[in-house]
């Protein structure tokens, strides 16, 4: 048996700012990197927000389709060896507390999805 290469895809999710005041926005950076020795195909990224987050916008190599608290990005056809793609998801803080965004990634070569969670603290300033 000859193995010509294996894709190894890394999913990272980080908030660009934390904590965030209620009413303000925070942008999450969703990075997918192919650390393997073969390309990966049909990369699907799905983000799910807590109810206290309101969708504002998204940007990246594929467009997001918003369905309630779920943002499904259109599939990325391929990710070459050593290649990295970044999606940006901006949300508005709607209530005070410690909240999460959950991101799932699946590809043709993965046997099961990869999941990452990022916590962000939303606060209010006393008046």
Question: At which residue positions do the language-model features occur?
Answer:
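Exported/extracytosolic protein signature
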Residues: 1-127
């Amino acid at each position: 048996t000859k193995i010509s290469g294996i894709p190894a895809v890394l999913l990272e999710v980080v908030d660009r700012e934390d904590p965030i005041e209620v009413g303000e926005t925070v942008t999450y950076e969703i990075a997918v990197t192919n650390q393997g020795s073969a390309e990966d195909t049909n990369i699907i990224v799905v983000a799910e927000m807590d109810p206290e987050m309101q969708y504002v916008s998204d940007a990246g190599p594929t467009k997001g389709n918003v369905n309630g608290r779920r943002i499904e990005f259109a599939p990325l056809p391929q990710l070459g060896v050593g290649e990295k793609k970044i999606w940006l998801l901006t949300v508005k803080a709607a209530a005070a507390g410690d909240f999460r965004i959950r991101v799932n990634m699946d590809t043709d070569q993965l046997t099961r999805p990869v999941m990452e969670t990022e916590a962000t603290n939303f606060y209010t300033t006393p008046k």
